[in-house]
Amino acid sequence: MAAPAPAGAAASPSPKPQLPSPFAELVKTPSGLEKVVLRGARNCCAEIYLYGGQVTSWKNDNGEELLFLSSKAIFKPPKAIRGGIPICLPQFGTHGNLEQHGFARNRFWSIDNDPPPLPVNPAIKAFVDLILRPAEEDLKIWPHSFEFRLRVALGPSGDLSLTSRIRNTNTDGRPFSYTFAYHTYFFVSDISEVRVEGLETMDYLDNLKAKERFTEQGDAIVFESEVDKVYLAAPSKIAIIDHEKKKTFVVTKEGLPDAVVWNPWDKKAKAMQDFGDAEYKNMLCVEPAAVEKPITLKPGEEWRGRIALSAVPSSYCSGQLDPLKVLHG
């Protein structure tokens, strides 16, 4: 196994990191944590904290926030930030022996000034590359050496993409396995007026019923109570329709076979110290993931998983998406 990173290497970002994009700015927040602000075309923007490598804000050209961030979110390590897009690695949820959702979301990442080449759209100007390597404390609980490179980018039309590359850097010949998720919190106007399309007839594991396996009905998913499901072999595109705002989020995923859908509803919301009692009404998590079948990498192998998020106006006729063919086109 590779030698652990020097003490403190993963505990704080570089003193004066250089940002490769003139459309990215490193800002120190009132909490003392640093974040990168990406500014795209037509006033679109996104914010990414170095703590957790976590996107916490994504705004469209009207300045409208598209991601949910709890008003009670705690910006103090080692607490994870409630909202945005936490990264779950090397374990999703309780699917393993590590802490809930693994440790990547509550470690300090560094700006990656020399990432390996990544095919990109030349029209994308606003982006940042981050990197996470294990510190000694991580190797004690998960004894594997790895490099996790993350690119967050704003497209010319305001879409947001996250590309993860995870490489096994063990030097002792050992493979490792992990589960993963982009724990994406979408901001919605009213959860009772939201429906999700693209997961009809899919098999899922119900985390509220001891991970028992069921098959979804043929209708779009609507929300009337707590939901915590892992949809298996989910399609590459999923649509989240917010009727009240006449807006559709389109989630496109690559390298991530599953999709988690979660809303804690009222009782669990009240039990969380970093979540407002009624905030469940304004959020929905739809999380591209690899949960049922862990990803295994041999030394030197690299995995890539990507999501692209967009928000488009939606019109509805007889409960179907208009001819934009969001799910298929």
Curated annotation (Swiss-Prot):
The active site is at 183, 287. Gene3D superfamilies: 2.70.98.10. Residues 1-20 are annotated as: Disordered. It comes from Cenchrus ciliaris (Buffelgrass). Keywords: Isomerase. Its EC number is 5.1.3.15. This is Putative glucose-6-phosphate 1-epimerase. The keyword Isomerase applies. PANTHER family: APOSPORY-ASSOCIATED PROTEIN C-RELATED, GLUCOSE-6-PHOSPHATE 1-EPIMERASE. Belongs to the glucose-6-phosphate 1-epimerase family. It catalyses: alpha-D-glucose 6-phosphate = beta-D-glucose 6-phosphate. Substrate binds at residues 82, 100, 105, 228.
